[in-house]
From Swiss-Prot:
This is GTPase Obg. The gene is obg. It comes from Mycobacteroides abscessus (strain ATCC 19977 / DSM 44196 / CCUG 20993 / CIP 104536 / JCM 13569 / NCTC 13031 / TMC 1543 / L948). Residues 160-340 form the OBG-type G domain. It is found in: Cytoplasm. Pfam families: DUF1967, GTP1_OBG, MMR_HSR1. NCBIfam families: Obg_CgtA (TIGR02729), Obg_CgtA_exten (TIGR03595), PRK12296.1 (NF008954), PRK12297.1 (NF008955), PRK12299.1 (NF008956). PANTHER family: DEVELOPMENTALLY REGULATED GTP-BINDING PROTEIN-RELATED, MITOCHONDRIAL RIBOSOME-ASSOCIATED GTPASE 2.
Length: 482
């Protein structure tokens, strides 16, 4: 079973908002209590948060499908539904969030860094919130909206100061084990290291993090060996260290050719954070060369022979032995000085006043176009019309009538008439297709009344206040009867 996972694909689904409640207040001696249905609760959101105690994406490897709780339904007595709890997913420091197209959505660095992966759906309004002068006791409520549903790729890029690169069995894991308290797997065969190993190196009163990545071989860019994918863990490293095996017996290999081969593979790697990292490209990172295994006499002689040639590249060269621990102390202090110099060379972050710029959403706009798949039909697109469709309970005639009133006030009906829509033609809004029937001809003033009634044709025997005043004046002889 894998214990270290640095790349996973997750499917996150936010909670659905609770439905609104259609309720009428019932109380003794109050025959007209009015609507008292509460609103539905908001669905829970899916949030990624950095936790320093988490070091791998292993949990998401076994449980990639994640869903936040739904909001609860509103109830009578003006009781709103409870909001769904947010689902907070703990991720390691250095996690990069990418979408389906490979675009970076967030780079989570630092304890407590957060990213809203999927927003919860809004709750539906109860009939108390829908009451108006024309519709005093609505017999319907709005449905809750579904939460966002996304597929995200999480990549872990280790946060370290020094990255060790080299051929397999060059002694990288051994170097980490003797410089820190880390206990990586060490064996006398290549590709012993399959996952990055981190260790904290102490230099006097200072300390830094060192990362050991699996070995590189020529042709890794084409997939040989373990490939180049694990090099994502050195993208954040301020200093790169070439660990060279001076005691290798493989034909055709020497320290200089090994360094050239490593540089060639590093140049072919395309960092994901190249445009976003303040450290710049990998080719611009400070480098050091560690000539390892000088406890072997032949290796010590070879190290002395190539030191001058390697130094001409402008990189510091160190002769060390992880077995006898010779040369380790000067190496650690030199690496710390390189880290300090690299940090000082970084551009100072400009402290600017945080400005929140929400993504503009045109909720008032909509478009009406001919339906290419249904001759004679039309398609209505817009944030508000499509949301209203999702919130409507089509089993309730009054709710459907309320939807028609909202679309008419928005101007959808007039736009359909301008495009030559005929009564009975198919109109698609969101996932719903229905036969369109205009409420009134275009240009006619609409008399506002409750759904299901028409003040222009409905007659009532109820005597109004104006009629009672007129009758009282006639009885008193103040006016002549009509």
């Amino acid at each position: 079973m894998p214990r270290f996972v640095d790349r996973v694909v997750i499917h996150a689904k936010a909670g659905t908002g609770g439905h609104g409640c259609a309720s009428v207040h019932r109380e003794k001696f109050k025959p007209l209590g009015g609507p008292d249905g509460g609103n539905g609760g908001r669905g829970g959101s899916v949030i990624l948060e950095v936790d320093p105690q988490v070091h791998t994406l292993l949990d998401f490897h076994f449980h990639p499908h994640l869903q936040a709780p739904n909001g609860t339904q509103g109830m009578g007595g003006h009781r709103n539904g409870a909001n769904g709890d947010d689902l907070i997913l703990k991720v390691p420091d250095g996690t990069v969030v990418l979408d389906d197209d490979g675009r970076i959505l967030a780079d989570l660095v630092g304890a407590g860094a957060r990213f809203d992966a999927a927003a919860g759906g809004r709750g539906g309004l109860g009939n108390a919130a829908l009451a108006s002068r024309a519709r005093k006791a609505p017999g319907f409520a709005l449905l809750g909206e579904a939460g966002a549903e996304v597929d995200l790729t999480l990549e872990l890029k280790t946060v370290a100061d020094v990255g060790l690169v080299g051929f397999p069995s060059a002694g990288k894991s051994s170097l980490v084990s003797v410089l820190s308290a880390a206990k990586p797997k060490i064996a006398d065969y290549p590709f012993t290291t399959l996952v990055p190993n981190l260790g904290v190196v102490t230099t006097g009163e200072n300390s830094f993090v060192m990362a050991d990545v699996p070995g590189l071989i020529p042709g890794a860019a084409e997939g040989r060996g373990l490939g180049l994918e694990f090099l994502r863990h050195i993208e954040r490293c301020a200093v790169l260290v070439h660990v060279v095996d001076c005691a290798t017996l493989e034909p055709g290999r020497d320290p200089v050719s090994d360094i050239d081969a490593l540089e060639n593979e590093l140049a072919r790697y395309q960092p994901t954070l190249q445009d976003d990292s303040v450290l710049g490209d990998l080719a611009d990172r400070p480098r050091a060369v560690v000539l390892n295994k000088v406890d072997v006499p032949e290796a010590d002689e070879l190290a002395d022979f190539v030191t001058e040639e390697v130094s001409q590249r402008g990189w510091p060269v160190f002769k060390v032995s992880t077995l006898t621990r010779d040369g380790l102390r000067p190496l650690t202090f030199a690496l710390w000085e390189m880290i300090v110099a690299a940090r000082a060379a970084r551009p100072e972050p400009v402290k600017t006043r945080p400005v929140i710029r929400p993504i503009p959403v045109d909720e008032s706009g909509f478009t009406v176009s001919a339906d290419p798949q249904n001759p004679g039909g039309f398609v209505v697109r817009g944030v508000r019309p499509e949301r209203w469709i999702r919130q409507t309970n089509f089993e309730n005639d009054e709710a459907v009538g309320y939807l028609g009133d909202r679309l008419a006030r928005l101007g959808v009906e007039d736009e359909l008439l301008k495009l030559g829509a005929e009564p009975g033609c198919a109109v698609t809004i969101g996932d719903m297709t229905f036969d369109w029937e205009p409420q009134t001809p275009a240009g006619v003033d609409v008399t506002m009344s409750g759904r299901g009634t028409d003040a222009r044709i409905d007659k009532t025997d109820r005597v109004g206040a104006a009629e009672r005043r007129q009758a009282r004046r006639v009885r008193r002889g103040q006016v002549e009867p009509e």
